[in-house]
Amino acid sequence: MKENNEILIIDDEIDICKQVSGLLNDKGFSSKYKFTAEDGLELLKSKKISLVLLDIWLNNSKFDGFQTLEKIRNIDENIPVIMISGHGNIETAVNSIKKGAYDFVEKPFDGELLIFKVKKALENFDLKNQLIIN
């Protein structure tokens, strides 16, 4: 896993953004958060982001998480995206992965599990990039 991975959190809940950002920063990751899909997509276009944590229900955006995921794929088809939701179930998790997410985490989430999934996603992304380069 490469150093200096920048993680983007897109969630309309300020407390969740701060909690996740703090957790990631404590584990040595750099993170930014945006409260709307539109702001998150703009940042993704202008900055090198290694992974996106994306809420499914973005109440203050034009797009929900699934629509935002599709737009992320138009910007970067390979970036790992982990969907997060407080209203999730197995169907939501499966739907997230079918639509191109790397993984799914349900709120409230266990911090250790979230960090594990982030590390795994970044490791797999790095391996995939190495295979493409070689």
Language-model features: where?
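His-Asp phosphorelay/catalytic-motif detector in bacterial-type signaling
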Residues: 4, 48-50, 74-80
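C-terminal output helix
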Residues: 89-91, 105-118
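Two-component/phosphorelay signaling modules centered on CheY-like receiver
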Residues: 2, 14-32, 38
